[in-house]
Amino acid sequence: MRNFTELYRMDLPHRAISVYIYLADRANKDGICWPSISTISKDLKLSESTTRRALKDLYRAGLIQTEQRYRENGGNSSLLYRL
């Protein structure tokens, strides 16, 4: 969704709208990005818990899909977000 008019008309809290625009700005041409919760929070000046709530809002609204990414050693990495 590059035309944000639809987004603004949705019944979403401002935290979710801010995070969606952030993800859209960082997404590649396929609508994929993988910033960490810490990075999103720092860049948007939100707490990590607020960022997590915003991501849940977006997931429930069907605006994002998430996929767990893993490091070579098997440890968790940041989530992949698909818009």
Predicted regions and their residues:
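Short recognition helix of helix-turn-helix/winged-helix DNA-binding domains
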Residues: 1-65, 74-78
